[in-house]
Amino acid sequence: MNNYLVKNARLWNGLDGKMGALTTSVWVREGRIEALGQAADADFDGTQCFDETGQFLIPGLIDAHVHLELDPSLRSPAQQLARTPDEIVASMKRYARDMLFAGITTTRDCGGGAHREHGLRAEIDRRRVVGPRLLCCGQPLTSPGGHCHFWGGEVSSRLEVEAMLSRQIEADSDWIKVMATGGVFTPGSRARDTQFELGRLVSIVEGAEKAGRHVAAHCHGTQGIADALRAGVRTIEHASFVGEKGFGTDIDESLMLEIGRSTCWVSPTVNAGWGRRIKDKEGAPSVFFERMSNCLQKQRASGIRFIASTDAGIPGVAHHDLAAGLAAFSKYADLTPVEVLRSATSEAAIALGVEAETGRVEAGLSADFLLLDSDPLESLDALNDPRVVVFRGEWLDRETRRVAPAKA
C-alpha cells in the first residue's frame, strides 16, 4: 500500500500531554505521512481508506538499547559464543521481526562481535527482512579483558583506540559504544569498576565526533558515570550508581544534578526482568526495587532526561518485550504513562538523532505508528498487543503478524 487514509482515530502525536479529544485523519503516501487532519481529508487523492473508529493512534515505539546478537535464553558468554554464525543470523532475523510486530519501529543495537547487525540493517532497509529501523554501534570499545572483551573491541593505547574507531566507522556504524565500567555479564568483571581513565574516554569521544558519530557509554559504577559525562558522551547506558553493596547504593546527587544540566541522556535499561524483581518472595517490595526506584526517582528529580531501553538479549529479556519494560519503568521511576511514552517515542528519537525521521506523528516524517484498542495514556497495558503496526507505511494488522513467517 503506497497511498491510503486512516480516518476517525484519536491521535497522540508523541508530544502532547494528553490524547487528542477529537478523531482525526492521517494520510500516508510512499511510506511517509503526507498530511494530518483537515488537510489530509481535503487533499487525499487515493481510494483506500481505513475507518479506525474507536482506535488510538500513537508513534511507533523506540527501544534505545538492545543486543540482537544475544539469545536471551542463554545464561553465559560461553553459551552465546558456542552458536554458529548461521544460527546467530537466523535468530537475529526472528528477533527483528518479533520486535516490529510488537510495535517497536526503531531500535539501537548497542553491541555485538561481528557486525552482523549491520548486515541485518541493510536487509531491513531493502525490505528483504521484516524488522525495525536499526541503528548500529558495532563492537564496543573495552579495556583488555574488560566487559564484553569477547566481542573483539579491546583497546588500551591511543593508537588502538584510533584503529578500533576506524574499524567501526568503516563498518558504517551509526554510533560508537564504549564500556566505561565493568559489567554483570562478563566473568571476572565488576560493574562498579572503571575501565578507562577520563583522558582516554575524551579521546574516544573526540575521535567519534570527528567521524560524525555520537558515543553511548555503558556505565554502572558512579565514577564511570562521572567520567563518561565529563568526556562528553551522548547517552549514558544503565546509570546504575553501583557501589560495594550493589546497584543503587552509591548515589551521588550532585552528579545527578550535573547530568540534569547537561545535554546528555540516560538510557536506564529498565526491562521485564526488573518487573519480575519488584516484589520479594513474601510479596513485599524487594531490596532491588527499593534501591533502584530511589535511584531513578532521584535522577528524575534532578532533571535527567530518560530514554526507554531494555538491554534486550541479556538473560531473560526478550527482544520484543518493550511493553513490559515500559510498565516496569513507570513503577521504578514513578513516571506517568505520557512521560513513559515520550521516553519511548519523541524523546528517544531526539537522543538517537533520528527526530527528523521518526518519533512523532507529523507530516513529513516516516509513517511509523501504532493503532491500539485502548488509550495508552490511561494505561500502558494498551501497548501489549497493537491492533495495527505501521512501519515506513507498511500496514501490519494482527492477522498479518500472526501468520507471517520470518524471512530467511
List each model region and its residues:
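N-terminal metal-binding scaffold of metallo-dependent hydrolase/deaminase domains
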Residues: 1-44, 55-57, 374-379, 394
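C-terminal cap of metal-dependent C-N hydrolases
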Residues: 9, 344-346, 350, 363-407
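Divalent metal-coordination and catalytic microenvironments
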Residues: 9, 26, 31, 54, ...
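Metal-associated gating/positioning segment near the N- to mid-region
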Residues: 55-126, 199
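Active-site gating loops and adjacent loop-to-helix segments of metal-dependent hydrolytic enzymes
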Residues: 67-88, 97-100, 130, 138, ...
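Histidine/acidic-residue-rich catalytic or RNA/ligand-binding cores of hydrolases
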Residues: 72-75, 117, 186-189, 225-233, ...
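Histidine/acidic residue-rich metal-binding segments in metalloenzymes
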Residues: 119, 160-240, 244-266, 283-306, ...
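His/Asp/Glu-enriched, well-ordered alpha-helical/loop segment
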Residues: 210, 289-372
